Amino acid sequence: MKWSEISVHTTNEAVEPITNILHEAGASGVVIEDPLDLVKERENVYGEIYQLDPNDYPEEGVIVKAYLPMNSFLMETVDEIKEAINNLLLYDIDLGRNTLSICEVNEEEWATAWKKYYHPVKISEKFTIVPTWEEYTPVHSDELIIEMDPGMAFGTGTHPTTVLCIQALERYVKENDTVIDVGTGSGILSVAAAMVGAKDIQAFDLDTVAVESAKQNIELNGVSEQVTVKQNNLLDGISGEHDVIVANILAEVILRFTDQAYDLLKKDGYFITSGIIGQKKLQVKTALEEAGFDIVEVLSMEDWVSIIAKK
């Protein structure tokens, strides 16, 4: 079978939404070639468990590659992808070069080539993310292993916004906490929350692809008893009081429900936000404070920030 390799040259800021667009278009596997992976700070802090080849990466920007089957609808699908990517400009997302190219690959090449980009990665004091096909032995007795299948939707969990969220969950979630995961995507944050002791986690996403992806990853990691995944628009219709709300989505979306998040948290509860590009940090901080939150910590990695607020 013949496959088309779709390559989008963009920016780090646009990687996650473009990845989601490609998966929704039917991509079977996505590769992210980000030169920042070669020099990430966490190499020094945690130590990467594999070596990267600089020849596989662009000199600037980020290349997102996706694989679509060759068929009569391919160019129509490509046009839809281009339109969806261009619509990201409405959210003030920098698309950089924003070029798209196509080349043909054999199934044998596709089935093995993209796996070379995915290896176990230690992303925090406790957590290591491991692709499902990799054999991995924990280095420490208290190491927590999250298994992910990068062939599924919504990436591998090693994007800075996800890493910052997991580091915050590790720090602020307590045993038996109740947690809401807004815009769950792959479900990785719900998995992490369960692994650090949360007893009841509600994971929401408006996208049906995300809901199914999250369910699979939650089952894969053995935390189905603690996590419930449902299709829902942000916090609409949600009630009760909760210990932690976590949201790794665009800054503009976070701004829509800061008041709702405040109302749904217990006293001294935490709102962990991420997906915020550095230039929008002040805007989100101001909105959180106006909603009544106290800012307790701001974590940063590359151009991204995670803001932790307390009720």
Curated annotation (Swiss-Prot):
E.C. number(s) listed in UniProt: 2.1.1.-
A biological process term (GO) from this entry: methylation
Keyword set, alphabetical order: Cytoplasm, Methyltransferase, S-adenosyl-L-methionine, Transferase
GO molecular function, one term: protein-lysine N-methyltransferase activity
Pfam families xref list: PrmA (PF06325)
Subcellular location, principal: cytoplasm
InterPro entries the UniProt entry points to: Ribosomal_L11_MeTrfase_PrmA, Ribosomal_PrmA_MeTrfase, SAM-dependent_MTases_sf
Localization per Swiss-Prot or TrEMBL: Cytoplasm
Cellular component, GO annotation: cytoplasm
NCBIfam families in the cross-refs: prmA
Annotated function: Methylates ribosomal protein L11.
PANTHER family attached to this UniProt entry: ELECTRON TRANSFER FLAVOPROTEIN BETA SUBUNIT LYSINE METHYLTRANSFERASE
Protein name in UniProt: Ribosomal protein L11 methyltransferase
Gene name, Swiss-Prot/TrEMBL: prmA
